[in-house]
């Protein structure tokens, strides 16, 4: 979940993240508890805003945060230091294949990406321009040492990777039997070249056996009011209780 941009940056076509309502976030925490999640994996943790919000809303379970940008990870480590159930992984990016990649670090840290910005994003958010590039190791999530060694059996995976969610999800295939839920950033318009659109991401999640459960508002373009991104929460079909399955709809 993202920090609200300073209103001074909301002029013109700059992006303004819609403040995510407390009620959907509380529903998410309730969902974690009902699904008996024993580990939340926060991929693309930035400064730890997502984990901090879960804690604020009462989630007391284990959290593993993953962030490749050194200064953000250092801040994340400091933030998690007083919480024995909150761990920070090694500084890596997540992808479908191990290797190294160039991360384009944005002036807006939560807009940093392994993918190039689209012309639309360049026009909408000049402040998201890259200010430097760094080489980062890329690992598959199912090969991440902190997860390979983890005893967790009911993992909730959140991916907020600025267009790289599809690749990271592919790299989590070996963990899918242990992943009961997903939270994926969904782009309603193309903001990063090569990213999967929202329809393709939902199709991908469903093909892996996860059903849409909850949607959280994301970025809007302030001049038009058009929503540009949202978060989709998905539950593994066989992890959903019988009474809850009965309320599902196949409407598209």
Positions of the model-derived regions?
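Phosphate/nucleotide-binding beta-alpha loop and adjacent structural elements of enzyme active sites
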Residues: 1-252
């Amino acid at each position: 979940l993202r920090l609200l941009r300073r209103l001074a940056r909301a002029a013109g076509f700059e992006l303004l993240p819609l403040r995510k309502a407390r009620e959907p976030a509380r529903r998410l925490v309730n969902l974690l508890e009902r699904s008996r999640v024993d580990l939340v994996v926060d991929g693309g943790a930035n400064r730890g805003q997502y984990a901090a919000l879960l804690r604020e809303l009462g989630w007391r379970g284990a959290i593993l945060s993953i962030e490749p940008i050194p200064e953000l990870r250092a801040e994340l480590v400091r933030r998690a230091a007083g919480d024995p159930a909150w761990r920070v992984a090694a500084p890596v990016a997540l992808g479908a294949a191990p290797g190294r990649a160039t991360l384009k670090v944005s002036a807006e840290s939560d807009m940093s990406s392994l993918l190039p910005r689209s012309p639309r994003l360049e026009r909408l958010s000049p402040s998201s321009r890259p200010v430097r590039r760094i080489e980062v190791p890329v690992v598959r999530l199912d090969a991440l040492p902190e997860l390979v060694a983890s005893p967790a059996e009911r993992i909730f995976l959140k991916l907020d990777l600025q267009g790289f969610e599809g690749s990271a999800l592919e790299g989590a295939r070996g963990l899918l039997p242990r992943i009961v839920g997903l939270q994926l950033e969904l782009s309603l318009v193309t903001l990063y070249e090569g990213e999967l659109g929202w329809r393709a991401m939902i199709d991908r999640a469903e093909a892996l056996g996860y059903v849409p459960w909850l949607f959280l508002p994301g970025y809007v373009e302030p001049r038009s009011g058009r929503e540009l991104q949202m978060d989709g929460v998905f539950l593994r079909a066989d992890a959903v209780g019988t009474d809850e399955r009965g309320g599902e709809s196949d409407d598209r």
